[in-house]
Amino acid sequence: MVLFTLEDFAVFKATTLATRMHLIREQLDPKFAEAATVIVPLLQTDQQQAIYSHIAKHQRRYRNPPPNTWVAFSTSSRGYKMVPHLALGFWDDRLFLWLSVLRESKPASRVLTGITAMATTLPGKWQVAGEHTDKAMLPLTSANLATVGARFQTIKKAEFLLGKVYLADDPIWADPVRLWQDIQQRVVALKPMFDQLVQNV
């Protein structure tokens, strides 16, 4: 069973590139790989549409250590940035699960068609954001969803993220089993929107 714990945040206390990368490879990547064995089947209910996992490699890092790390799930075996995808990962103070459409997917101008109506029916608390390299986020409301969606459509570098953020001070971290169960439930809840985004592209 995959268990993400508060101890995982210690990876980001390493201040050098080599040390942090070593800790990411030793501590987080194995958990991401194990998580993928569960999440891929949750997303791949249609056997005609394969889902691939992509663990961040940080190959372009030469001096500064990565501020975050993740595993992404997409319908492309070659990568994930160019297509809608699901990302599960860490910053130094939070775990995130984002359904993401990055700027690289921009040629598909109608990629968000149908998403607003689906998002407003999600149970529980969710967040939206407009930039995957920034921690900034907003609670999921109709108004915030409209704002992020409009920005995505009108600003070239804007992105669209919808999902769940687990801050390090969230009480759920006291029960790693419950956290993992919640992540899986949210993957299932996001799957219809994931499928719609893939279809739109």
UniProtKB/Swiss-Prot annotation:
Xref: Gene3D superfamilies:
Protein of unknown function DUF1054
What Pfam families has UniProt attached to this entry?
DUF1054 (PF06335)
Instruction: Fetch the SUPFAM superfamilies from UniProt.
Output: YktB/PF0168-like
Highest taxon above the source species:
Bacteria
InterPro entries in UniProt: UPF0637, UPF0637_domain_sf
Give the protein family: Belongs to the UPF0637 family.
Q: What is this protein called?
A: UPF0637 protein LSEI_1198
